[in-house]
C-alpha cells in the first residue's frame, strides 16, 4: 500500500497520511444500499454501542466468502476500496463469465490468476480445504462451519497458521493468539489479507473521523458522577476507586468478557493472549 503524506498547507492536512492508489468503482450487480438508521441505538433509541453516528452513505459490496466457483480459473481485474471494511477487495472475472468480489490477498496484483477447489496449487489467493494444505501454511478467510463461508481472519493484515492435523480436525493459530480446532473439511484462502499498513494511516483531523461514522471518545474521569463511575471530584481528581470500571459500574481492564459454557469451549486449546 502506498502512503501519501500531505504537505502542511492547512491545519487539517498537517500530519495527514492516507492511501493514494486504491480507488472505488463498484459494479451495479454486486452492490446494494443499506439502511443505517441505528447509529448504535437499539429499537428503543437507547445507545447500546457508544461512539457511533453520522458518517457518509455507503453501498454494500457483496463479497464472495464461500469461494464456491470450484475448479474455474478467475483473473483479478481491479483492486478496489471498500468503505465497509479496512481490507481491500478484488474484482474477479471467472472463465464461465461469473464476476465476484473477494478479499484482496497481500501481494496480489491485477492480472493474477486464482482458483478454488480440492486439488489446486498452494498459491496466494487460492482457496481449498484445510485437509489439502501442508502444515505451516499461512491462511485467511477461514470457515468455521462447512459451506457457510469464511468467518475468521478477514480484517486487513490478518493471517492464521495451520499448525497440526489429526483425525477429523485441524489445529489453527489465529491472529489473536488463540489456538483452536476446526474441521479439516472447512476451506480457507492461502496467504495474508492485504492492506497491512492500515494502522500507518493518519486521518489528520477530526472531520475525517466523522466521515467514517465514528464519534468522539470522552474520558470518564472528566464526566460528572451521574454519567460515569470515574466522574466528579475537584479539578484533576483520580477515579476514586481501587480498580477502573465501565460506564455501567462493571470491572474493566482484565475481566473476561467471553460468555460461559459456549459450545466451542471444548474446541479452544489455548485462549487468546491480550
UniProtKB/Swiss-Prot annotation:
Example of a GO biological process term: mitochondrial translation
The keyword Ribosomal protein belongs to this UniProt entry's keyword annotation: yes
GO cellular component: chloroplast; mitochondrial large ribosomal subunit
Pfam families on file: Ribosomal_L2, Ribosomal_L2_C
Localization of this protein: Plastid, Chloroplast
Chief location: plastid
Record GO terms (molecular function): rRNA binding; structural constituent of ribosome; transferase activity
Annotated region described as Disordered, given as residue ranges: 1-21, 225-274
Keywords of the record: Chloroplast, Plastid, Ribonucleoprotein, Ribosomal protein
Family (UniProt): Belongs to the universal ribosomal protein uL2 family.
Subunit structure: Part of the 50S ribosomal subunit.
Protein name (record): Large ribosomal subunit protein uL2cz/uL2cy
Amino acid at each position: 500500500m502506498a502512503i501519501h503524506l500531505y504537505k502542511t498547507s492547512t491545519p487539517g492536512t498537517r500530519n495527514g497520511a492516507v492511501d493514494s492508489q486504491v480507488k472505488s468503482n463498484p459494479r451495479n450487480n454486486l452492490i446494494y444500499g443499506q439502511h443505517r438508521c441505528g447509529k448504535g441505538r437499539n429499537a428503543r433509541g437507547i445507545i447500546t454501542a457508544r461512539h457511533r453516528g453520522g458518517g457518509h452513505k455507503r453501498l454494500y459490496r457483496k463479497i464472495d466468502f464461500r469461494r464456491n466457483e470450484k475448479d474455474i480459473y478467475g483473473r483479478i481485474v481491479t483492486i478496489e476500496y471498500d468503505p465497509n471494511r479496512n481490507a481491500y477487495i478484488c474484482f474477479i472475472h471467472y472463465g464461465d463469465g461469473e464476476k465476484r468480489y473477494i478479499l484482496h490477498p497481500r501481494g496480489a496484483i491485477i492480472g493474477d490468476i486464482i482458483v478454488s477447489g480440492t486439488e489446486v496449487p498452494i498459491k496466494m489467493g487460492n482457496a481449498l480445504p484445510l485437509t489439502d494444505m501442508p502444515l505451516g501454511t499461512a491462511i485467511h478467510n477461514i470457515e468455521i462451519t462447512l459451506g457457510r463461508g469464511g468467518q475468521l481472519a478477514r480484517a486487513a493484515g490478518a493471517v492464521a497458521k495451520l499448525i497440526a492435523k489429526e483425525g477429523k480436525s485441524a489445529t489453527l493459530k489465529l491472529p489473536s493468539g488463540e489456538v483452536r480446532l476446526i474441521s479439516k473439511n472447512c476451506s480457507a484462502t492461502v496467504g495474508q489479507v492485504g492492506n497491512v499498513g492500515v494502522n500507518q494511516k493518519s486521518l489528520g483531523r477530526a472531520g475525517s473521523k466523522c466521515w467514517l461514522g465514528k464519534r468522539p471518545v470522552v474520558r470518564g474521569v472528566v464526566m460528572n458522577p451521574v454519567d460515569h463511575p470515574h466522574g466528579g471530584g475537584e479539578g484533576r481528581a483520580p477515579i476514586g476507586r481501587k480498580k477502573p470500571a465501565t460506564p455501567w459500574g462493571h470491572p474493566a481492564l482484565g475481566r473476561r468478557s467471553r460468555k460461559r459454557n459456549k459450545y466451542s469451549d471444548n474446541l479452544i486449546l489455548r485462549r487468546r493472549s491480550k
